[in-house]
């Protein structure tokens, strides 16, 4: 017999009745029924019920053990009585009568209870993550992550992609988020950077003549954390040679749709080949965001024209200085009280906006300050244009175009949630396409890149030389699912002269481009194919499939929201010698002192 087990804790069934078996695992739960002790023995695979009565040598040992102690049990498999069968367990038709028990490890007082769904503070869960990972939900999430990655690998290989590995110690890049830097011992005063993405390397693989690359790539970004962000994360990084934007879509849609269908647990998924293509400008108008949740049926409309010379002072003033007025319908709100609408306005102000105007309507009668100021006839024109009914309310977001779009987008989400309009049980994908190549930076008073500076502009050199930069679109695209951006990608700018021209428009001279991006530019001067790709985030994919609120619930050992590893104590100080070896010293940041109601740096 094996030293620890003949079967795992999910393997036994009625066909094993009469056998003598050996099981090992954690003491998940105990129930004392007056001289008979029932123990749920748990391992990675499942749970088996162990029975120890007064005739069993295992009874006094098991009785004294604390939960989560690790034991090896020898015993006989017996069928449960009909009334004792547990249909929720694979082993629910049998139980093992313990003959003997060997203690492998005694558990002390537990910081959190494994067999309970009780919630615990995140700092406790992260400090004792190895215990938290024993809990069913989190254990299941990590297994789901493994299965998703395996499925992705198989599907990418089937699509003709080859898996590569790219360097972890790389050069620092001037664009994007902050780098995590690593000092060099052999080259004093110089630093490596952990890659924010394998962007340069994967493009250079295309220049090297490989055709379809992918990897499950670790990425590192020193940025502020959110529920859907982590300083270290993984992405399905891929790149393809001699492709158009449509070729990229056709390659990755079957992978994403297939993975989601495989693990959706009954939820519907947008079919491959049917991902809607939504231009960026349309997304910002209709949804107020470039990450639209298409489960929400509400659509934003622009009614600016209705308030030009309208006599409604506030909106007329906003429109007069180039602002926009956007509206969000609130269907069938005739039974909602005035408080519902006022609460939405209060919510907008708490979110940092100036406020959210509204119109109420019940059986055709308009209500609210905007309807009063704009007049029922003018309001009816808006309702007719938008196809709204006699019991539909309307919320108004007004201001500079970006501000109005942002408020309208947030309000669309809020109204959809408050009215229960968000469709459940589905994953709705879309592509956001036709991003602007450039934007005007109000703070710097100059034109700069809108998103990815290395995207190919639509129209290439002709567009750069002849069009208004703010009208030039890029071959850039995002994949969005249920309001989450899963990936950004682009057809790359592989032509040095077009790249120089694009950077020139954004205010960078040729010398700066050569200095900052020498590796890429020099490679492109030696023969580069047209190429493009993307990089869907693994953590966000698993988060959606697991129906979790943040990505820390699908990462085995995540950092907390302060980028700390509470379990291992990272980041930590290192011995002075370790700093001397890499030729660096630490300088404490200036302490902040309270002066009146403000914190100021103490630079003395």
Curated annotation (Swiss-Prot):
Keywords: Aminoacyl-tRNA synthetase, ATP-binding, Cytoplasm, Ligase, Nucleotide-binding, Protein biosynthesis. InterPro entries: Aa-tRNA-synt_II, aa-tRNA-synth_II, aa-tRNA-synth_II/BPL/LPL, Asp-tRNA-ligase_1, Asp-tRNA-ligase_1_N, Asp/Asn-tRNA-synth_IIb, AspRS_core, GAD-like_sf. GO terms for biological process: aspartyl-tRNA aminoacylation. Its EC number is 6.1.1.23. ATP binds at residues 221-223, 485, 537-540. SUPFAM superfamilies: Class II aaRS and biotin synthetases (SSF55681), GAD domain-like (SSF55261), Nucleic acid-binding proteins (SSF50249). The record marks 33 as: Important for tRNA non-discrimination. It is found in: Cytoplasm. The keyword Membrane does not apply. Homodimer. Aspartyl-tRNA synthetase with relaxed tRNA specificity since it is able to aspartylate not only its cognate tRNA(Asp) but also tRNA(Asn). Reaction proceeds in two steps: L-aspartate is first activated by ATP to form Asp-AMP and then transferred to the acceptor end of tRNA(Asp/Asn). PANTHER family: ASPARTATE--TRNA LIGASE, MITOCHONDRIAL, ASPARTYL/LYSYL-TRNA SYNTHETASE. This is Aspartate--tRNA(Asp/Asn) ligase. It comes from Erythrobacter litoralis (strain HTCC2594).
């Amino acid at each position: 017999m094996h030293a620890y087990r003949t079967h795992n804790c999910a393997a036994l069934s009625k066909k094993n009745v009469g056998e003598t078996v050996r099981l090992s695992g954690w003491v998940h739960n105990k129930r004392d029924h007056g001289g008979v002790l029932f123990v749920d023995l748990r391992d990675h695979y499942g749970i088996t019920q162990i029975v120890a009565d007064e005739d069993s040598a295992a009874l006094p040992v098991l009785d004294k053990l604390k939960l989560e102690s690790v034991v090896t049990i020898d015993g006989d498999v017996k069928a449960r009585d009909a009334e004792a069968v547990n249909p929720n367990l694979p082993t629910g038709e049998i139980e093992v009568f313990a003959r003997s028990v060997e203690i492998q490890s005694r558990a002390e007082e537990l910081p959190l209870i494994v067999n309970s769904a009780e919630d615990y503070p995140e700092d406790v869960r992260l400090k004792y993550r190895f215990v938290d990972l024993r809990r069913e939900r989190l254990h299941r999430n990590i297994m789901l992550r493994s299965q998703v990655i395996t499925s992705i690998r198989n599907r990418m290989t089937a699509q003709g992609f080859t898996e590569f590995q790219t360097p972890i110690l790389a050069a620092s890049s001037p664009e994007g988020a902050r780098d995590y830097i690593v000092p060099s011992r052999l080259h004093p005063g110089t630093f490596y950077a952990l890659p924010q993405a394998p962007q340069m390397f994967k493009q250079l693989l295309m220049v090297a003549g490989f055709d379809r690359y992918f990897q499950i790539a670790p990425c590192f970004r020193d940025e502020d954390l959110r529920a859907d962000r982590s300083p270290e994360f993984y992405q399905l990084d891929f790149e393809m040679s001699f492709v158009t934007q449509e070729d990229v879509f056709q390659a990755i849609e079957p992978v994403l749709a297939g993975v989601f269908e495989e693990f959706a647990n009954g939820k519907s998924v947008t079919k491959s080949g049917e991902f809607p293509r939504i231009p960026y400008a349309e997304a910002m108008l209709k949804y107020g965001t470039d990450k639209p949740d298409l489960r929400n049926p509400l659509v934003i409309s622009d009614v600016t024209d209705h308030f030009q010379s309208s006599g409604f002072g506030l909106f007329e003033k906003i429109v007069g200085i180039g602002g926009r007025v956007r509206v969000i319908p609130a269907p069938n709100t005739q039974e909602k009280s005035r408080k519902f609408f006022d609460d939405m306005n209060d919510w907008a102000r708490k979110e940092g906006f100036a406020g959210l105007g509204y119109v109420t309507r019940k059986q055709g009668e308009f209500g609210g300050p905007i309807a009063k100021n704009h007049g029922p006839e003018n309001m009816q024109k808006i309702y007719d244009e938008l196809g709204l009914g006699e019991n539909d309310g309307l919320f108004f977001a007004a201001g500079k175009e970006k501000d109005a779009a942002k408020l309208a987008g947030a309000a669309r989400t809020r109204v959809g949630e408050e009215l229960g309009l968000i469709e459940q049980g589905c994953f709705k994908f879309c592509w956001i396409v036709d991003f602007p190549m450039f934007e005007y930076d109000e703070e710097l008073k100059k034109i700069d890149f809108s998103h990815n500076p290395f995207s190919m502009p639509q129209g290439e050199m002709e567009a750069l030389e002849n069009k208004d930069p703010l009208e030039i679109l890029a071959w850039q695209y995002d994949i969005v699912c249920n309001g989450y951006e899963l990936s950004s990608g682009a057809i790359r700018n592989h032509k040095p002269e077009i790249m120089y021209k694009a950077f020139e428009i954004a205010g960078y001279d040729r010398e700066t481009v050569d200095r900052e991006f020498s590796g890429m530019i020099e490679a492109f001067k030696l023969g580069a194919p047209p190429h493009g790709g993307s990089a869907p985030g693994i953590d966000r994919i698993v988060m959606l499939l697991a129906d979790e609120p943040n990505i820390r619930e699908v990462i085995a050992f995540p950092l907390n929201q302060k980028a700390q590893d509470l379990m291992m104590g990272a980041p930590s100080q290192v011995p002075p010698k370790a700093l001397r070896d890499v030729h660096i010293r630490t300088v404490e940041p200036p302490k902040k002192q309270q002066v009146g109601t403000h914190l100021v740096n103490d630079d003395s």
